[in-house]
Amino acid sequence: MEIERVWGVQGIGITARLRWRLFIPIQVRGVTVTWTTRAIGETGTRYMSARPDEEVTPIKSILYGVDLVPGDSVVVHEGPTDCWATGPGAVGVFGLNVSPTQVAEIGSYGRRTICFDDGKDAQKRAERLAERVSVLPGETNVIRLESGSDPAEADPEEIAELRKLCL
């Protein structure tokens, strides 16, 4: 399975705190520095992440998928499932709130395309992120998908076009 092979995702069985979730390691330079989990079903808390005492690096100070960026272009998404849909070159910021450290990391790439979910709040925050990043050298764009509410639900042909144009 590509998600397991490329992104290192694993399943969690019946543990007390993280029952029936996908375990998503977050790596920087090949080292897992923190993690998050995603509920398998649609009930319960969608994402649960490492507590501060369980992580080497705070989750909001890094970008998900940064080790898989092949060049100087990134597509910025909210979270891991969107990154999986887009593939290597996509990075995630773990939600709609983007830290100054994440802004600087995004700005270190010459070409940044921000692609958040199609909700009104998400689109507003994508525009705000673009404003923050665009003061840094390079090209910054915001794109809104036409075929789905987010990359994980979008038409694979549209995702292929996104990759072709932006990565």
Locate predicted features.
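Replication-associated primase and helicase/ATPase modules
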Residues: M1-I12, P25, R29-T32, V74-V76, ...
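Phosphate-handling DNA/RNA-contact segment within nucleic-acid enzymes
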Residues: E2-R111, R125-A126
